[in-house]
Amino acid sequence: MKIKAGIVGATGYAGAELVRLLTAHPEAEISAISSVSFEGDKLSDVYPSYTFLNDMVCENQDAVVEKSDVIFAALPHGLSQELAAKCIDAGKAFIDLGADFRLESEEEYTEWYGGTFLDKKLHEQAVYGLPEFFRDKIKGKKLVANPGCYTTCSPLAIAPAIVNGLVSTKGIICDCKSGVTGAGRKPNQGNHYPELNEGFHLSLIHISEPTRHSLIS
């Protein structure tokens, strides 16, 4: 029997990509999806490339929780905590693609994301979801914080060289640049092509996560 997976925030960039990945997953099936902006609309009306999912309609969050074994949240930072509590209380697994559960320290979370922990005990249940390093810790857990892009690509690229003794762990520099899909679909001047083309913008928020998770020792 396949795992029933629901997606909250399925019409954002991350959510839409998750739809694509889960439709091809041999052990999972999408049970329900939700979208605040497109509730009641077909996903294929939002993304014509998903015409093969013509009968998949965006519902509300409660429907996703009710119909699913595991709920993925592809929401902006700060919007996953209440939903996570609801899912855990209902005995469902919850995987957050945002940053709400990535940092163990509330002080650091407030510093970088401007929010607070709504339930500290809930945060204590969260496990960092990078299976290449933490597979044993993730097994059986109900609340998983999906790692961000920098904390995924950098350690996974470096680890084979370190494990095989090809490089020293001292003096490693990760020179990273990212695109703007992580900023979401909502248009704004900062994400407008003429503002971004051939330019770089310093984003210190990405420092918080890699420096708080010792992935390689």
Where are these regions (language model features)?
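Single conserved hydrophobic/aromatic residue that forms the stacking wall/gate
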Residues: I205-S217
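N-terminal Rossmann-like NAD(P) cofactor-binding subdomain of oxidoreductases
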Residues: M1-S203
